[in-house]
Amino acid sequence: MKLEAVHHVAVIVSDYKRSREFYVEKLGFEVIRENYRAERDDWKLDLRLGDMELEIFGMSHAPVRPSYPEACGLRHLAFRVDDIDEAVEWLASRGIETETVRMDSFTGKRMTFFHDPDGLPLELHE
């Protein structure tokens, strides 16, 4: 067996409508599938950005993350951009604040962080 690529990343959110608006309307993800699962009383939303898929589970009863951002599990989700200054301006025009742009000492590339509505760290990496 040979692993070919990461197929998707899954994120549990506390407010489905708020997170759907954030990822689709503000960040520009494309909706692939959307389904309410009555037996679980939750929403499942499959999104696409380029070749990457993001799976959103809207679970109002999910426990909160125990510590931030150093809890076990997903630390952050990073997006590659060509021009970080342009990307920061684009996010600002949608009401999304970012941290100060800084240099990644390991890669020598510029990066910054922002957060989704549940506080999940999201990274821009040039």
List where the protein language model places each region:
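Vicinal oxygen chelate
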Residues: 1-2, 88-126
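N-terminal beta-strand motif that seeds the catalytic metal site of vicinal oxygen chelate
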Residues: 1-18, 74-79
